[in-house]
Amino acid sequence: MMIERHLRSQFGGGQHAGTGAYMKYVRIPGTAQPRNGRQDSVQKGEKMIKLGIVMDPITSINIKKDSSFAMLLEAQRRGYEIHYMEMNDLYLRKGEGRARTRLLSVEQNYDKWFEFGSEQDIALADLNVVLMRKDPPFDTEFIYATYILERAEEKGTLIVNKPQSLRDCNEKLFTAWFAELTPDTLVTRNAQQIREFWQEHGDIILKPLDGMGGASIFRVKHEDPNLSVIIETLTEHGNFYCMAQNYLPAIKDGDKRVLVVDGEPVPYCLARIPKSGETRGNLAAGGRGEARPLSESDWEIARRVGPALKAKGLIFVGLDIIGDKLTEINVTSPTCIREIEAAFPISITGMLMDAIEKRLA
């Protein structure tokens, strides 16, 4: 009851009236199960959901932090038939998207967290849903995989996230469609334009459009003698675009990852706080994670972006927010489920699987 009172006081009314719907995703203490959520989707008279997942090798994941693993646990709890795939399992034959799959079972066991069952060669359209959870880089191989998945989508398989939207929505450039929510942003490969932007703001962030985990992100302060070489490095002497944004001092309080499930924000986020002397909050760059309830500005940003994400078939998305500014929209393989669920009594994977089942209905 204490947990329920906490969520009601946090989300049950006020400016977020209607968010009492999150109550069904309260987890029973000491378990992974939602208190009021569905216990098993395979009930009498129901057809088993066949779920495929395309991911990096399950042999090398850290199950304590891996969001894909959390999704698999919830899918298994609901009685789904899970088909495991890696990128090299996908192929096209006579215009049909196909794959070599292995049936998969998982458990919360740090010594043995998965077991493969039978192997089969199937049409991807035989699956009800496929989770595309391959981590970046978003390169030509990733793009080719989306075309293969799209062939199954055309025959009725739900792909999470939608293949066309994975191609269309670059995680950094997509913020331009919500410019009123972002820092001042410049995307260019022109060195002079970058210098003028730097002179205007005096303290800027420069980053590539295809990076992840904080790689190749530079802070350039006033009179920094390294500006020219940084521009040359990121643009490869004017041949590639990069992004410039004014520096946000609020980064000291964390780069917040706000998860959005089929247009609806998860009521908690993970703030990635930079280590001393660092600009980047990314956990991969040494940042420290701290789970928090959403702030009013977090809610506002997520509510304004959510409908566009849902319309594009972007069912599971991670917004990056610094202070009250949107900096990135992560669509390829968003993370932080495990960290948030470890800190607060909510089943994010329950929200996701319910959204998937609603779309399949």
Where are the regions a protein language model picked out?
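Short, Lys/Arg-enriched N-terminal segments with co-localized hydrophobic residues
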Residues: 38-47
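Conserved N-proximal alpha/beta basic substrate-recognition cap immediately N-terminal to
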Residues: 59-187
